[in-house]
């Protein structure tokens, strides 16, 4: 499995991430496009995509602080859930 930092809305995996993000979390837990761009500008914010071959598997987003990491979102593609990716 490959781990890929998604660091902007211009990243090649951004659209795959956004699709999974919007179907995996209720609207009140989702960022707007503007809010996501602001998160990308913070050094503490990380969005990591996971792929296997050319298949987008899932992602994790987290904030890394000096004494802890806060996992904000984690999701696996609907068709791949229950297969050990999480």
Language model: regions and residue ranges:
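Short amphipathic alpha-helix that is part of the acyltransferase structural core
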Residues: 1-35, 51
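Residue-level detection of beta-strand scaffold positions
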Residues: 9-13, 45-47, 56, 76
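Intrinsically disordered, low-complexity segments enriched in polar/charged residues with Gly/Pro
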Residues: 34-37, 62
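A short helix-loop-beta-strand connector motif used in the catalytic cores of GNAT acetyltransferases and
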Residues: 38-49, 70
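Conserved beta-strand in the GNAT
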Residues: 49, 54-63, 68-75
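Conserved acetyl-CoA pyrophosphate-binding loop and the N-cap/start of the following alpha-helix
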Residues: 80-85
């Amino acid at each position: 499995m490959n781990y890929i930092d998604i660091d902007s809305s211009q990243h090649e995996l951004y659209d795959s991430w956004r699709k999974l993000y919007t179907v995996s979390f209720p609207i009140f837990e989702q960022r707007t496009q503007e809010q996501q761009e602001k998160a990308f500008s913070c050094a503490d914010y990380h969005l990591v995509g996971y792929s296997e071959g050319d298949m987008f598997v899932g992602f994790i987003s987290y904030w890394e602080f000096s004494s802890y990491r806060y996992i904000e979102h984690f999701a696996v593609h609907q068709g791949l859930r229950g297969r050990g990716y999480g």
